[in-house]
C-alpha cells in the first residue's frame, strides 16, 4: 500500500542524503550563542546549523524554537545535541561557551577555569571538523583565542577571535550619531585588546577619504574642545552599560559574528578588526592574540594589513600585549 508521500511525490533521482556545503556550528546556547544563531539564520549563511551545549533541556528547547521558525528561514536543517558528532563536517565553528566571572575572582582564575572547559570542547570540534575555521567569542576573547589555537593544533589562520569587530562597529555607530552620517560611511578602527585597553586609531578616522584628524588636529587628545576622546570612552563603557541595564550583551555581538562568517563563506576578502597572533608585529615579542585589520576569506584569516600607527598607538598595543602575556604565561595544562 503506497503511503501518502509516495502518492504525492514521483521521484526522478534516487534519494541520497547530500552533505552540507556550508555547515555552521554554534557551541553554547546562552544569550550570545543564540544571538549568533539567529543572526546566521537571518542572513541565510548556512545550509545546516548545529547547536551544542551541556544543558540538554535548554539545548533541545532552543533547537525546537528555531525549527518552528523554519518557514521564515532559508536554512533547511537545524540540529542539536550535547554529543559533538552532531557538528561533523562544519566549515565554521563559533565558540560562545565558557564560565562566568564570579564576584571578586581574579582574571587569571577565570581564564584558568575556562581553559579547563576548552580542554574538553576544542579537541571535540577538531575531531569532527578537522578542516573548520574556529571563531572564538567567549571572553576574555583574546586570551581564549590563544588557548584555542594551542589546544586545537590548527594553523593560526583558522583560529580567529571576534576581537574588536564589535568595538569598531560601536565606534562607527557613535561617530555616525555625532556626524549625522550612516555608520557604513564613517570609517574608524579600534584595535588591540577587546575591551578596556583597546586602541582607537585616530590617525585613520575618515569620512569619504577626508581625514578627520586633519580637520581637527587635536582629535582624540585631552586638548580637543569637541571631546572626541569621549567616543572611544563610550565604546569601552557601552558593554558595561548594556550589562547593567539588561544583564548581558548579545544582539550586537551576534550580528558582528554573522558579519565575519558572511565574509568567509562568501569569500569576500573584506577587512575586519579581529584577533590574530601578533608576535613579530609592532615590536611585540610574545605569542599573544590582538585585533589588527585582517583580510578574511574562504581560507580563513589570510593576511594582516600593515596599518601605519603613531608611536603612542604602538605603545598602547604593546601595553595590551604585555597585560595579556602576564596572564597567559601562568596558564597551566596548555
From Swiss-Prot:
One Pfam family, short name: Ldh_1_C
UniProt main location, coarse: cytoplasm
Domain of life, per lineage: Eukaryota
PROSITE patterns per UniProt: L_LDH
Subunit structure of this chain's protein: Homotetramer. Interacts with PTEN upstream reading frame protein MP31; the interaction leads to inhibition of mitochondrial lactate dehydrogenase activity, preventing conversion of lactate to pyruvate in mitochondria.
Record family assignment: Belongs to the LDH/MDH superfamily. LDH family.
Protein name per Swiss-Prot or TrEMBL: L-lactate dehydrogenase B chain
The species this protein was found in: Monodelphis domestica
Amino acid at each position: 500500500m503506497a503511503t501518502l508521500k509516495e502518492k504525492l511525490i514521483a521521484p526522478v533521482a534516487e534519494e541520497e542524503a547530500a552533505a552540507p556545503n556550508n555547515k555552521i556550528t554554534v557551541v553554547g546556547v546562552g544569550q550570545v550563542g543564540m544571538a549568533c544563531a539567529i543572526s546566521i539564520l537571518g542572513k541565510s549563511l548556512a545550509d545546516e546549523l548545529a547547536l551544542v551545549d551541556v544543558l540538554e533541556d535548554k539545548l533541545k528547547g532552543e533547537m525546537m524554537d528555531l525549527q518552528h521558525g523554519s518557514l521564515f528561514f532559508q536554512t533547511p536543517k537545524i540540529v542539536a545535541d550535547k554529543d559533538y558528532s552532531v557538528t561533523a563536517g562544519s566549515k565554521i565553528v563559533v565558540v560562545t561557551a565558557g564560565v562566568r566571572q564570579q564576584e571578586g575572582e581574579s582574571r587569571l582564575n577565570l581564564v584558568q577555569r575556562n581553559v579547563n572547559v576548552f580542554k574538553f570542547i576544542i579537541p571535540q570540534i577538531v575531531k569532527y571538523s578537522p578542516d573548520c575555521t574556529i571563531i572564538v567569542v567567549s571572553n576574555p576573547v583574546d586570551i581564549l583565542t590563544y588557548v584555542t589555537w594551542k589546544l586545537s593544533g590548527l594553523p593560526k589562520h583558522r583560529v580567529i577571535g571576534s576581537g574588536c569587530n564589535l568595538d569598531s562597529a560601536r565606534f562607527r555607530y557613535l561617530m555616525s550619531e555625532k556626524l549625522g552620517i550612516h555608520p557604513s560611511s564613517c570609517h574608524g578602527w579600534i584595535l588591540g585588546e577587546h575591551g578596556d585597553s583597546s586602541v582607537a586609531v585616530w590617525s585613520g578616522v575618515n569620512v569619504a577619504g577626508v581625514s578627520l584628524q586633519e580637520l581637527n588636529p587635536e582629535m582624540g587628545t585631552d586638548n580637543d574642545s569637541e571631546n572626541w576622546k569621549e567616543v572611544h570612552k563610550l565604546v569601552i563603557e557601552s558593554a558595561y552599560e548594556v550589562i547593567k541595564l539588561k544583564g548581558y550583551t548579545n544582539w550586537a555581538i551576534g550580528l558582528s559574528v554573522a558579519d565575519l562568517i558572511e565574509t568567509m563563506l562568501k569569500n569576500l576578502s573584506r577587512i575586519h578588526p579581529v584577533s590574530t597572533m601578533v608576535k613579530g608585529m609592532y615590536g611585540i615579542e610574545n605569542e599573544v592574540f590582538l585585533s589588527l585589520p585582517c583580510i578574511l576569506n574562504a581560507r580563513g584569516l589570510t593576511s594582516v594589513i600593515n596599518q601605519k600607527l603613531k608611536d603612542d598607538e604602538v605603545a598602547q598595543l604593546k601595553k595590551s600585549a604585555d597585560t595579556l602575556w602576564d596572564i597567559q604565561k601562568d596558564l597551566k595544562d596548555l
